[in-house]
């Protein structure tokens, strides 16, 4: 077999494997993304969030759409999907490229961001107002999003699951008070003494 032919065969095999590798990479990437919102899935979010938590300035925030079932029942699932997609986009924009946002399931989202300036409280207050704006694709939908957050530095011994539990307790308290934003306390969470709410699970 001539040398030019061998070269052509080698190039062809390399191209086939290159295309196959690209295709597999795209398949894996899509499997890690939530199909509705484009955010990371729970598993993909967990891996990235754990890396960010090595930074003592990390902040964990949990977001939950208020009255989501009522939105679905009143306006239909298309409006509910539009609300979730818009909420996800607004969260991702607020967190930026240096953080990570994921959809944990249903109408619940989580994010980890780095807050070196100590402005998380102000940022989340603004974010809550942004999340309460009407949805362009479904302007008849009006609701709010409750946020609970916790600083990594306040609980250095906690892993991601523990921090999510604290953020969840704060978020549940936010649903019952004004402003729709609560920071997890430094001690035992009064709003959630028994841990996460029934049916809620922390990241593995």
Residue ranges and their predicted role:
Residues 45, 49, 84, 88-91, ...:
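Heptad-repeat coiled-coil signal-transmission/dimerization helices
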Residues 73, 114, 176:
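Short, conserved catalytic or interaction motifs in soluble domains
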Residues 31, 50-59, 63, 74, ...:
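Nucleotide second-messenger and two-component phosphorelay signaling modules
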Residues 29-47, 63-76, 85:
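Conserved nucleotide-binding and Mg2+-coordinating catalytic segments in signaling enzymes
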Residues 138, 162-203:
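Catalytic/regulatory signature loops of cyclic-dinucleotide turnover enzymes
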């Amino acid at each position: 077999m001539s040398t030019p032919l061998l070269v052509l065969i080698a190039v062809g095999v390399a191209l086939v494997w290159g295309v196959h590798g690209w295709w597999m990479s795209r398949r894996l990437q899509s499997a890690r993304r939530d199909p509705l919102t484009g955010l990371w899935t729970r598993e993909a979010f967990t891996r990235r969030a754990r890396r960010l938590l090595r930074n003592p300035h990390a902040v964990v925030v949990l977001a939950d759409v208020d009255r989501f079932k009522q939105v679905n029942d009143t306006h239909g699932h298309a409006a509910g999907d539009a609300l979730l997609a818009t909420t996800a986009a607004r969260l991702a924009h607020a967190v930026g490229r240096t953080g990570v946002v994921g959809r944990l399931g249903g109408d619940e989202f989580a994010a980890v961001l780095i807050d070196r300036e100590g402005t998380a409280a102000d940022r989340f207050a603004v974010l809550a107002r942004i999340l309460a704006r009407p949805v362009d694709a479904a302007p008849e939908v009006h609701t709010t999003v409750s946020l609970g957050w916790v600083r990594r530095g306040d609980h250095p011994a906690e892993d991601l699951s523990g921090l999510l539990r604290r953020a969840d307790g704060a978020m549940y308290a936010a649903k019952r008070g004004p402003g729709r934003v609560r920071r997890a306390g430094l001690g035992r969470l009064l709003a959630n003494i028994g841990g996460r709410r029934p049916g809620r699970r922390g990241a593995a």
